[in-house]
Regions:
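Short, acidic/turn-prone active-site loops that include or flank metal/cofactor-
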Residues: 1-2, 57-59, 181-184, 205-211
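Nucleotide phosphate-binding/pyrophosphate-handling subdomain across enzymes
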Residues: 1-3, 13, 78-201
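Hydrophobic beta-strand segments of well-ordered beta-sheets in folded domains
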Residues: 26-28, 51-52, 176-179, 200-203
Length: 223
């Protein structure tokens, strides 16, 4: 849960606010299907006469692994096998969602007509995923900033993100893992801290903005 002061304190309340982006007659793709939220999205889509697709109902991504080059390899139904520049495990769900969006963009005429060629759109999708950071400027998504030792940057700031990050921090075969960690004071601090693995080395810090939790307070909460 995140931004609860604006969106609500339960998944169904947050889903209701998020569903406000559904526009009349415009298709919508929902990337994550949860029992608490599915009916909320279905009701809003019906109200707006909008086609709704739950990406997890018919997965496009059938397998995904980390490569030796610190990228993520995807095996998909409609786009073959390709590499994604963003290596984090959470990208599997994001990629599956995006691959459901592409056909809808074509159908809605929101991509150039020449992209309707299957070979061309497949090539473009593969290129986009392999160069996503340089094409978009997206940073801090399990981003390798150095090797020997591996240095990884991630902007995970809520329990959803740390459910993935906590596992990822324990998945490598490293004799030691050092974590430099800071968080905003208005986040679910205890919830996030519950996902931090034990027996790692932690260095608590803060951002320069006023919302940041002081490192001393963060250390005390972590203890």
């Amino acid at each position: 849960l995140d931004h609860t002061e604006f969106l609500g304190s339960t998944l169904s309340e947050i889903a209701y606010e998020k569903a406000g982006i559904i526009k009349p007659g415009v298709p919508v793709v929902v990337g994550e299907d949860l029992p608490e939220t599915r009916q909320v999205f279905l009701d809003k889509a019906k109200e707006n006469n909008s086609q709704i697709i739950f990406a997890e109902d018919k997965p496009e991504v059938v397998n995904s692994t980390m490569t030796e080059n610190y990228t993520r390899l995807y095996e998909t139904v409609g786009y073959g096998t390709f590499e994604g520049q963003l290596a984090g495990e959470c990208q599997i769900k994001n990629t599956n969602t995006i691959l459901h969006v592409v056909p809808l963009l074509l159908k809605q005429g929101l991509l150039p007509q020449s992209y309707n060629d299957k070979k061309r759109i497949t090539a473009l999708v593969r290129e986009a995923f392999s160069e996503v950071s340089s094409l978009t400027g997206l940073m801090g998504r399990w981003q390798y900033a150095g090797h020997r030792p591996d240095i990884v940057l991630d902007t995970g700031h809520n329990t959803g993100g740390w459910a993935y990050l906590g596992k990822a921090l324990q998945s490598g075969n490293y004799p030691q893992v050092h974590v430099i960690f800071g968080i905003m004071a208005d986040k679910d601090i205890d919830g996030v801290l519950s996902f931090l693995p034990q027996k790692l080395h932690y260095y608590f810090t803060r951002d320069s903005v006023a919302r940041a939790l002081p490192p001393e307070a963060l250390r005390d909460r972590a203890e």
